[in-house]
Design a protein with these regions (language model features):
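C-terminal accessory/tail domains of diverse enzymes
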Residues: 1-93, 97-98, 174, 190-197, ...
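Carboxylate/His-rich catalytic cores and anion/metal-binding grooves
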Residues: 116, 120-138
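Short, structured patches in soluble enzyme cores that scaffold and shape functional sites
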Residues: 131, 185-189
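The substrate-binding groove and active-site-proximal loops of carbohydrate-active enzymes
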Residues: 95-106, 184-186
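Well-ordered, non-membrane alpha-helical segments in soluble/globular domains
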Residues: 108-113, 316-319
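Short, conserved phosphate-binding/catalytic loop or strand-edge motifs used
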Residues: 175-181
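Acidic, His- and aromatic-enriched active-site or binding-groove loops in soluble protein domains
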Residues: 145-172
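Short, low-order "capping/linker" segments at domain edges
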Residues: 140-154, 226-237
C-alpha cells in the first residue's frame, strides 16, 4: 500500500477531528473490582441478575451480549452513560457520558454506585476502590466470553512465545483483577500539541498523588503495579505502545511519526478478531500481503535517593494550585473537588500508601476493603 495513503489515513483519524468546531466536554471512566466477602469466587449469575436490575431501575438499554447471551454492556440513551464489565465479570466499569460540569458526573456516578452497592450487599458482595482486587486469589479470573476479550487474553498469554531481552511478568490475566480510571477531554487543533506536552509533564505528579494498585503480599514495593502489568506484558514489546512519549513532541509531524511507529497485534475481519505478533503500523501496510521515565520511579513506595522529597511536594502543590485556578476560572465551584488531593499532598500520601500503612498497623483486609468502598 502507498505510504502516503497510510499517512493520510492516520491524519484523518487522529488529527483532522480536532479541527472541527465544537464545545468542550469531559468524560470519565471508572473501573472497580467486585469482591465476594465470603472469600469465594464471584458468582457471575449473581452479577448478571444485578445487571438486569440496574438496567430496569435506570432504564439502560442493552449494548452488548457475550456468546452465552449475558449482557456485558448497557447504555443510557439520555446522557450516554455506560455500565459495562471490563475483561471479566469480576471488574465493573461505569463510563460517564460527556458533560460540561464535573458535579453532574459526580451526581450520576454516586447514584449508580449506591444502587449497585445496595444490590451487591444482598449477597455479601461489594465494590471497592482498590486498583488491584485484593481477593483475586479466590476469583475465577477468566475473560468475558466474546471475540474481543478472547483475542486479548490469547495475546497476553502469548508472552512465552517471545525470546526478547525484556522482562515479562507472569500475570497475563491481570485485566481480570486490575482496575483503572480514565478521563477524556475535548482538545482543539491549536491546543493539541501543547496539551499532550503538558499532560506528559504531569505524569510523575499523577503517580505521586493517585497511585492505587498494590499487589498485596507479592510486590508491595510497587504503589502502582498496574503500570508494570501494562508495560511488561506483550503490549510493551513495542515501547511506543505503552507508557509516556519517549520524545518531546514539538509539532503534529512529531505526533504522526510517533503514531506511525506504534504496533498493532490484531485486526477485525468479518466480525472476527485475528491475532498476530505485534508489528509496526507502517510495516504492516507495507507487507506484500495484508530513555527511562521519572513516573516509573514514583510508582515505588521508596522514592529514589536523588529526589528531594520537600522539593517534590512543593512541585506537587504548585501543580495543584494551577489546577485549582483553572477550575475557579470555569466558574462552577469545582475547585472543592481538589481538596482530597491537597490533603494527600499535605500528608505526603496516596491511596496505595494508605492501604499499606493500614495493613502494617494491623487493620484487617476486609476492614480496608470496606473503607475503600465508601463514597467520599
Amino acid at each position: 500500500m502507498n505510504e502516503n495513503l497510510i499517512k493520510e489515513a492516520l491524519y484523518q483519524k487522529y488529527i483532522e477531528p480536532t479541527k472541527k468546531k465544537r464545545e468542550s466536554y469531559i468524560g470519565i471512566e471508572i473501573e472497580m473490582p467486585i469482591l465476594n466477602l465470603d472469600k469465594k469466587p464471584v458468582d457471575f449469575a449473581i452479577i448478571h441478575k444485578i445487571t438486569d436490575r440496574f438496567m430496569e431501575h435506570f432504564q439502560f438499554h442493552e449494548q452488548g451480549r457475550d456468546e452465552e447471551g449475558n449482557i456485558y454492556a448497557a447504555t443510557d440513551e439520555v446522557y450516554g452513560d455506560i455500565l459495562s464489565y471490563d475483561c471479566s465479570y469480576n471488574n465493573l466499569e461505569l463510563s460517564m457520558g460527556k458533560e460540561k460540569e464535573l458535579f453532574a458526573l459526580q451526581k450520576r456516578f454516586s447514584s449508580y454506585y449506591s444502587f449497585l452497592q445496595k444490590e451487591l450487599q444482598k449477597y455479601h458482595y461489594t465494590l471497592t476502590g482498590m486498583g488491584v482486587n485484593p481477593y483475586r486469589i479466590y476469583n475465577r479470573n477468566v475473560p468475558i466470553p466474546n471475540g474481543r476479550y478472547r483475542m486479548l487474553f490469547h495475546h497476553l498469554n502469548s508472552y512465552k512465545n517471545y525470546q526478547l531481552p525484556m522482562y515479562f511478568h507472569e500475570y497475563p490475566e491481570y485485566g481480570t483483577f486490575s482496575s483503572a480510571s480514565q478521563v477524556q477531554l475535548d482538545v482543539d487543533y491549536d491546543d493539541l500539541i501543547p496539551t499532550l506536552r503538558a499532560f506528559s509533564r504531569v505524569e510523575p505528579i499523577k503517580a505521586v498523588l493517585f497511585s492505587n494498585s498494590v499487589l498485596l503480599d507479592e510486590h508491595e514495593e510497587l504503589l502502582c503495579c498496574r503500570d508494570m502489568f501494562w508495560e511488561n506484558c506483550t503490549h510493551g514489546i513495542n515501547p511506543h505502545n505503552v507508557g509516556m512519549f519517549e520524545c518531546d513532541l514539538e509539532s503534529e509531524e512529531d505526533l504522526l511519526a510517533y503514531i506511525e511507529s506504534t504496533s498493532i497485534y490484531c485486526l477485525e475481519r468479518d466480525g472476527k478478531y485475528i491475532n498476530s505478533p505485534p508489528i509496526r503500523i507502517m510495516e504492516y501496510f507495507q507487507q506484500p500481503v495484508v530513555e527511562g521515565e521519572l513516573r516509573k520511579m514514583f510508582n515505588y513506595r521508596q522514592l529514589p535517593s536523588f529526589v528531594d522529597e520537600d522539593q517534590l511536594y512543593e512541585l506537587v502543590e504548585n501543580v495543584l494550585k494551577i489546577a485549582e485556578e483553572g477550575l475557579k476560572d470555569r466558574g462552577f465551584g469545582e475547585e472543592i473537588l481538589l481538596q482530597p488531593l491537597f490533603d494527600r499532598m499535605k500528608n505526603r500520601t496516596n491511596p496505595a500508601k494508605q492501604l499499606l500503612e493500614m495493613k502494617e498497623q494491623g487493620t484487617g483486609l476486609e476492614d480496608i476493603i470496606l473503607e475503600y468502598s465508601l463514597l467520599q
